[in-house]
């Protein structure tokens, strides 16, 4: 009891009630404060308000035109052919990437001037045609329900980043577009670019997804707060055979370019080009053979033939061609006329006599007999 009473007395001596204390400044001895100290110094201090975000407002329709910016931002792709075995190939003529579903697509990021520290690279997919550009590009329901990946990327996102644990998958608050962001990395020594490995997780032909609608992938270089530093874009087709599709589309593209070139040529020049092209086509007439005889191609070729019968046939053809190089066209025409006359006689078409006399046929008796 004695100890508890002593503790109560100690508590009463050290406890300061709010009525007695008043303001906290009364607890401080005046001898420790300078004479010019103002106890109301903190009365006019305002509480700092949160600043609005410096990120630019997101456009409802993203711009896909190239913008290298002050840093000279551009993209590169590894060289690849059109073999059927390739899983990813890029066409510079079409500015189009052909790839298989969920296969690695390396894209090289190149800058002339290093961007600020903390810059990021953002990849966004949009539809190419104006009638579809307002829609969000997302995976089809079938692939969206398919379990794949490491679980870091949302199931609806078309574009994913491979081999980078710092990738962040975003969905815009304004237009709900999907994007994936990775930090910009300085190229390693001896290299002029940084490579990002992308995957496209749905086929272009999938119903309920892209549904054969062409898409563009926009790669943008941004600061950490979203300010645009550079932008590039390219078309993407996700298909089963990238090499075959690239070869077909490049062939069609070249044909279209040739047609457009002919359309730009005036009609008079076009007719002259047509005449020149038709005159260069080989014809079996004698005049053309005369031109062939004057050809400067004197090289001799050897052809191996199996079987004597074929050899005799090809030999006759060769002898005829050699003869046509020597015989003038007029003699050739005269020879053809003789062949036609002989052919008519063999068919029994005998000429009628000029003065009405009956022409006797073999084994036919005359009237006198």
UniProtKB/Swiss-Prot annotation:
GO terms for cellular component: cytoplasm; mitochondrion; nucleus. One of its GO terms (biological process) is anatomical structure morphogenesis. It comes from the Eukaryota. CDD domains: P53. A motif (Nuclear export signal) lies at residues 312-323. Residues 342-365 are annotated as: Basic (repression of DNA-binding). Residues 246-296, 318-369 are annotated as: Disordered. Multifunctional transcription factor that induces cell cycle arrest, DNA repair or apoptosis upon binding to its target DNA sequence. Acts as a tumor suppressor in many tumor types; induces growth arrest or apoptosis depending on the physiological circumstances and cell type. Negatively regulates cell division by controlling expression of a set of genes required for this process. One of the activated genes is an inhibitor of cyclin-dependent kinases. Apoptosis induction seems to be mediated either by stimulation of BAX and FAS antigen expression, or by repression of Bcl-2 expression. The N-terminal and C-terminal disordered regions undergo liquid-liquid phase separation (LLPS) following homotetramerization and activation. Post-translational modifications, such as phosphorylation or lactylation affect the ability to undergo LLPS. This is Cellular tumor antigen p53.
């Amino acid at each position: 009891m004695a100890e508890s009473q002593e503790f109560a007395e100690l508590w009463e001596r050290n406890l300061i009630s709010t009525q007695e204390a008043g303001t906290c400044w009364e607890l401080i001895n005046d001898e420790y404060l300078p004479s010019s100290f103002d106890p109301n110094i903190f009365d006019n201090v305002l509480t700092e308000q949160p600043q609005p975000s410096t990120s630019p407002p997101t456009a409802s329709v993203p711009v896909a035109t190239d913008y290298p910016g002050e840093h000279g931002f551009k993209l590169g792709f590894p060289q690849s052919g059109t073999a059927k075995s390739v899983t990813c190939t890029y066409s510079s003529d079409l500015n189009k990437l052909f790839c298989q579903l969920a296969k690695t697509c390396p894209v090289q990021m190149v800058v002339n001037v290093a961007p600020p520290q903390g810059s990021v690279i953002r990849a966004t997919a949009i539809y190419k045609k104006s009638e579809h550009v307002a829609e969000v590009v997302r995976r089809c329901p079938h692939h969206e329900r398919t379990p794949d990946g490491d679980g870091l990327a949302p199931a609806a996102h078309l574009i994913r980043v491979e081999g980078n644990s710092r990738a962040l998958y975003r969905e815009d608050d304004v237009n709900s577009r999907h994007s994936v962001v990775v930090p910009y990395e300085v190229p390693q020594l001896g290299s002029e670019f940084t490579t990002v490995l992308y995957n496209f997780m749905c086929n272009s032909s999938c119903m309920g997804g892209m549904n054969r609608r062409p898409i563009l992938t926009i790669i943008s270089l941004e600061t950490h707060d979203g300010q645009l530093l550079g932008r590039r874009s390219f078309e993407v087709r996700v298909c089963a055979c990238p090499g075959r599709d690239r070869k077909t589309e490049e062939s069609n593209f070249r044909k279209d370019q040739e047609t457009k070139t002919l359309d730009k040529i005036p009609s008079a020049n076009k007719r002259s080009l047509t005449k020149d092209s038709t005159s260069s086509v080989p014809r079996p007439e004698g005049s053309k053979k005369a031109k062939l005889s004057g050809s400067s191609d004197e090289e001799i070729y050897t052809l191996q033939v199996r079987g004597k019968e074929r050899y005799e046939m090809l030999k006759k053809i060769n002898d005829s061609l050699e003869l046509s190089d020597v015989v003038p066209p007029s003699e050739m025409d005269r020879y053809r006329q003789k062949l036609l006359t002989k052919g008519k006689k063999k068919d029994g078409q005998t000429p009628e006599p000029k003065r009405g006399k009956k022409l006797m046929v073999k084994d036919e008796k005359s009237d006198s007999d």
